[in-house]
């Protein structure tokens, strides 16, 4: 993405959800040996609103596994890394599954809320606010049922013999 005089739209902030854990390990591969699921290379860039790459941005990812479960005590399918000089990052993971999550309202009533397949992401860069967002998979029939879903946060998916590649450019203000 070349630097431009036109301002790009900042990536939309979304809920962190209840499953973020601080202190994730710095690593590219967030899977474990023998983990079930379709391989996914999640890669992309972090840029400013002019399209200029942001080097040394901290990008933290966490997600459900291929059965729709989160590791809430450890760091399976969790990790962070720093972007390179061109603002690029890559994480090796698996395609997550949709799931139903409990949501408790102010009156203490709990109901189940559908979540389509997604990846959670936090991006932190010098002199900028932390971006917390989620990215989604195009064509998932459950996307429209998810309250957080939006076309503005869709991964660009390429299918390869080894699995999927999901790409996204995060734009920070």
Predicted segment positions?
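Beta-strand-dominated extracellular/periplasmic modules and repeats
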Residues: 2-173
């Amino acid at each position: 993405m070349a630097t431009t005089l036109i301002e790009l739209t900042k990536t939309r902030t979304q809920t962190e959800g209840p499953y973020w854990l601080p202190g994730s390990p710095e690593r590219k591969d967030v899977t474990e040996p023998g983990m079930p699921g379709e391989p996914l290379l999640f890669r992309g860039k972090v840029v400013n609103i002019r399209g200029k790459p942001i080097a040394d941005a901290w990008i933290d990812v966490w997600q459900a596994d291929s059965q729709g479960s989160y590791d809430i005590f450890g760091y399976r399918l969790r990790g962070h890394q720093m972007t390179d000089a061109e603002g690029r990052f890559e994480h090796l993971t698996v395609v997550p599954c949709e799931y139903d999550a409990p949501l408790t309202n102010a009156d203490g009533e709990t109901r189940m809320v559908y979540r389509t397949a997604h990846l959670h992401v936090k991006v932190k860069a010098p002199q900028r606010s932390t971006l917390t967002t989620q990215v989604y998979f195009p064509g998932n029939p459950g996307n429209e049922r998810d309250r957080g879903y939006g076309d503005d946060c869709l991964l660009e998916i390429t299918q390869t013999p080894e699995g999927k590649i999901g790409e996204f450019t995060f734009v920070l203000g």
